[in-house]
Amino acid sequence: AKTAGIDFFIFEMRSSNNISQYNQDISFINGLLTSSNANELKFAISYNFANMNLNNNNRIEGRNLVSKFIEDFKLMIPYFEKSNYMSVDGKKLVYITNAFNLFSNDNAALYQQMRAELRSLGFELFIIGDQQEWTPTLRFDFRFVNAVDAVTHKTYALINVNQYDVLNTFHKFTDIAF
C-alpha cells in the first residue's frame, strides 16, 4: 500500500443494531489490524447505519435508535485510540455512508448530541457525510448543515443509466456537482 502511495484505508463498520453484521465487520477490521505491518498505514471507519431501516416514516427518534447511534460511535473509541487512526486537524475522521438517508427530526441536533457525548470522553470528530451520486449539491442539505464537517458524493460510476431522470439530466447533475 505504501509503495502504491495509499495514504489510508477506510474500513466499513455497520451499526450494532444488527449485532451479527457488526461482529463480522469488527472481526474483519481486527484481523487486518493484527498484521505485522498494520501500524505503518493509517485507517478510518466508514459507519453504515442502513440496518436501522430508517426512512421518512421511521425516523431515528421514532424507532428509539438515537442511543444506539451514539453507542455505535462509542464503540469506535478503541480504534480512535490507535496511533495510526486517521485524523484531520487532531479530530478523528469518520465517514458516514449514505448520510443523506439519516432520517431524523433534527439532523444537526442529533450530530451535536453525539459529538457532545464523544467530546466528554475526550474525542473530537471530523465527519464526512456521503451524498447520493446523482443529486444536485443542495439536495438534502438539511441532513448536512451544522451536522457534518464535509460532504462527498458517491462515485458517478455507480449511476444506473436506465433511470429516466439520470439518463436525461446526468450532464446537468454533473455540472452542478462540480
Task: Identify the meaning behind each predicted range.
Residues 2-178:
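Glycan-processing catalytic domains of CAZymes
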